[in-house]
Amino acid sequence: MASFKPTKVLSYPKLGEKVTEETLYWKNYKPPVQIKEFGAVSKIDFSPLPPHNYAVTASTRVHIYGLHSQEPIRNFTRFHDTAYGGSFRGDGKLLVAGSEEGLIRLFDIGGRVSLRQFKGHSKAVHATSFLSDGFRVLSGSDDLTCRVWDVASAVELSSITEHTDYIRAIAPSKLNPDVFVTGSYDHTVKMFDVRSGNSVMTMQHGQPVECVLLYPSEALLVSTGGRYVKVWDLLKGGQQLVSLKNHHKTVTCACLSSSNKLLTASLDRHVKVYNSSYKVVHNFDCASSILSLAVAPDDEAVAVGMTNGVLSIRHRKHKEEKEALTGRRKRGPSYRFFVKGKNFVPRQDDFLVSKPVRQHLQKYDKQLKRFEVSKALDTALETWTRTTKPEVTVAVIMELNRRGTLKNALAGRDEVSLTKILNFLLKHITDPRFSRPLLTVGDIVLDLYQQVIPQSPVVERLLQRLYEILGREAELQQELLQVLGILDTLFASLMPRKEVASFGAAAAAQESQLQAA
């Protein structure tokens, strides 16, 4: 009796992802270094001047870390409650931070005691920053106000009350020291001019705004809130340029790289890098939800702060380190490996015993061996198989069709199993690799269940979608055939024409050859 032949599953080449220079650039980072903080890391800010230390705001402290250090080189612990929004001044010598108690503190990087305290907010101050002149501080608070303070005298210069909900994001202009942008939980993004005290532009984000960001040219503005990242064209009066929805949860922060590429981070634990056309070119995965994100100048490091109090820093690999890693060689085999069996000499009376190779069959092959065709199809349509290895499901269908039992396997299905088959058809019937056997399945399903389709609205809806997909595919095939006909005509017109001698001329030439002979 011949042995059972397992189902032959065709192997298809895997299409790798398109690797671009930007993808390689952002993959060129070491594994992250993780530092445990005292609470959720709400803000990270790099100093604009070398050695590019960065401030980390977490719990009731603001720590200053060196670019390659894992221990803080400076601690600011004068906060009685949670600290927020620690930010450097343009020269990297001063730092400002808000707090849950409503106070804003100004620190000298070289000292520990606060130089100034700005009092005036009645609720928590989540966003603080220096205006570009360096002599004024901007703050946004949960008391619905945005205020400007004088650094020298600690006096409030102006207060703006146009927002109707918490102000959680601010972005001062670097080109004009009197202009800044705010984002609020009232779903609006506003641009203000300190000289007038009123907003000069308003954009509707549509979700509570968590972060606002100005491009260096200040022609574009980025706002994040909810699952959306929106880019606004300020030169066109705040017109929306693009709306991105690549995250699954709230986008909490955004920043720009040295080449002005946009990076966004979300509660879904992903950092996404966009190119100039706002397509995702790389992802960084983190262990917990992300609250803060910052990129060092020249992209030397990417720092991420998370809700579980972990600060994660990825440093860029340098050429010397790459050469050191690639230059290592694996240890070669030992001497005993080479001399093993060297002195063995087979004898003439040796008897060679071949060990039989046991054949291991898959579950669907065992069922096919027992002629359980319906169970074999059910096994091939299991969730993991049909989603990760559709070629296995199609191979079982082709084997059933070869045996002539495909119709029997598809018959007698309930609504749940029929829904699985139809969903598989919807997903893969337009795939050129699987279209021929799946079209056969579709014909058999229509023949078997045509009378009972109206009884199930789910099956009827899936069949309607299948009908629409096949209609679009037929239209596409028709258009491709038309294009093929046009190309054939063009190629035929471009081909050089060959002159064909007439019958009379050929006969005269033959007669002249005979006379000459």
UniProtKB/Swiss-Prot annotation:
Coiled coil: none
WD repeat locations: 36-75, 78-117, 120-159, 162-202, 204-242, 246-285, 287-324
GO biological process: positive regulation of angiogenesis; positive regulation of transcription by RNA polymerase I; ribosomal small subunit biogenesis; rRNA processing
Gene Ontology cellular-component terms listed: nucleolus; small-subunit processome
Classification via Pfam families: UTP15_C, WD40
Alphabetized InterPro entries for the sequence: U3_snoRNA-assocProt_15_C (IPR018983), WD40/YVTN_repeat-like_dom_sf (IPR015943), WD40_repeat_CS (IPR019775), WD40_repeat_dom_sf (IPR036322), WD40_rpt (IPR001680)
Endpoints of the signal sequence: none
Major location category of this protein: nucleus
Subcellular location: Nucleus, Nucleolus
Keywords per UniProt: Nucleus, Repeat, rRNA processing, WD repeat
Protein function: Ribosome biogenesis factor. Involved in nucleolar processing of pre-18S ribosomal RNA. Required for optimal pre-ribosomal RNA transcription by RNA polymerase I. Part of the small subunit (SSU) processome, first precursor of the small eukaryotic ribosomal subunit. During the assembly of the SSU processome in the nucleolus, many ribosome biogenesis factors, an RNA chaperone and ribosomal proteins associate with the nascent pre-rRNA and work in concert to generate RNA folding, modifications, rearrangements and cleavage as well as targeted degradation of pre-ribosomal RNA by the RNA exosome.
Subunit structure: Part of the small subunit (SSU) processome, composed of more than 70 proteins and the RNA chaperone small nucleolar RNA (snoRNA) U3. May be a component of the proposed t-UTP subcomplex of the ribosomal small subunit (SSU) processome.
Protein name (record): U3 small nucleolar RNA-associated protein 15 homolog
Phylogenetic lineage: Eukaryota, Metazoa, Chordata, Craniata, Vertebrata
Gene of this entry: utp15
